[in-house]
Amino acid sequence: MRLNKMINNPLLTVKNLNKFFNEQQVLHDISFSLQRGEILFLLGSSGCGKTTLLRAIAGFEQPSNGEIWLKERLIFGENFNLPTQQRHLGYVVQEGVLFPHLNVYRNIAYGLGNGKGKNSEEKTRIEQIMQLTGIFELADRFPHQLSGGQQQRVALARALAPNPELILLDEPFSALDEHLRQQIRQEMLQALRQSGASAIFVTHDRDESLRYADKIAIIQQGKILQIDTPRTLYWSPNHLETAKFMGESIVLPANLLDENTAQCQLGNIPIKNKSISQNQGRILLRPEQFSLFKTSENPTALFNGQIKQIEFKGKITSIQIEINGYAIWIENVISPDLSIGDNLPVYLHRKGLFYS
């Protein structure tokens, strides 16, 4: 995250936002803030409320109650709902939605309000945005002459044209094939960073959010479970459900021996939680915490294991090891000379997380 983001006044503030469709509540007391230049990913499964939240910020959906502030300006509150066109936000959806009768240049010019882009100031701005998004050579093409990735870049350029401080993107890469998705995603994120705009992405792709977000908001059933940096959500989540959602995990019943140690089927595991209410619960570990090699002078714990399966995958070898009757998979980049049935030490790196 860039240093210029760390300022006192957030760009966007959402306070106690609720939304009902008839009698069904789809947003539950949503509150968060977004700093200038920050990129936030709303992460959750289909139907969790993330798109509804994005549309509420844009003004396409009217919340039932709560407040939305853009800088120090109220854009939604009690008896007040600022129209979408007056919020000065950019919005990009899954498949770009370009005007088929306008070429790329005119589509971007439409983002400036008149669809012409004829005066020198507008021309300069459009050319800057086309350079930024890597579509300068496509200026005279029409949407049907563009690939899916090119259409998404044009849609982003159109959203950036009026120089909004906040861009909202609703799963903009989901309609692209995997190879193209990786390329376009990286290019669009780079363009957003260079523009200085803040952005909120809706996604169900965990790896995408871990890789590109400054912060991630985990949304389940219309509620934000936790909002934090990708590293914090992965290694120090507040809730077990968040931990499991953020990546592959090993979860075992456990008992506290003291405030720093829990006992589970694997053995005694050092833990790092400091606020624990009960002595019985579950411990969470990530598979990558286990290694057949001593990668630090003081590993967190040491176990005796036996190899049960070996799967060679080229540069990676997956090894299933049983520790005290519990089997875990370890991936090794370096493939040592090992055989099924071998007994060997297994090292644990980093502490576990205990949830009561």
UniProtKB/Swiss-Prot annotation:
Gene Ontology biological process terms, A to Z: transmembrane transport
Broad class of where this protein is predominantly found: membrane
Topological category with respect to the lipid bilayer: Peripheral membrane protein
Keyword list, A-Z: ATP-binding, Cell inner membrane, Cell membrane, Ion transport, Iron, Iron transport, Membrane, Nucleotide-binding, Translocase, Transport
Keyword Cell inner membrane in record: yes
The enzyme's E.C. designation: 7.2.2.7
Entries under Pfam families matching the protein: ABC_tran (PF00005)
This protein's GO CC annotations: plasma membrane
Gene Ontology MF term list: ABC-type ferric iron transporter activity; ATP binding; ATP hydrolysis activity; transmembrane transporter activity
Binding site for ATP: G44, S45, S46, G47, C48, G49, K50, T51
Consequence of substituting R350K: In strain: NTHi TN106
Effect upon mutating S45A: In strain: NTHi TN106
Entry's localization field: Cell inner membrane
UniProt catalytic activity: Fe(3+)(out) + ATP + H2O = Fe(3+)(in) + ADP + phosphate + H(+)
ABC transporter domain mapped to chain residues: 12-246
Complex and partners: The complex is composed of two ATP-binding proteins (FbpC), two transmembrane proteins (FbpB) and a solute-binding protein (FbpA).
Record function comment: Part of the ABC transporter complex FbpABC involved in Fe(3+) ions import. Responsible for energy coupling to the transport system.
Family: Belongs to the ABC transporter superfamily. Fe(3+) ion importer (TC 3.A.1.10) family.
Protein name in UniProt: Fe(3+) ions import ATP-binding protein FbpC 2
Organism per entry: Haemophilus influenzae (strain ATCC 51907 / DSM 11121 / KW20 / Rd)
Phylogenetic lineage: Bacteria, Pseudomonadati, Pseudomonadota, Gammaproteobacteria, Pasteurellales
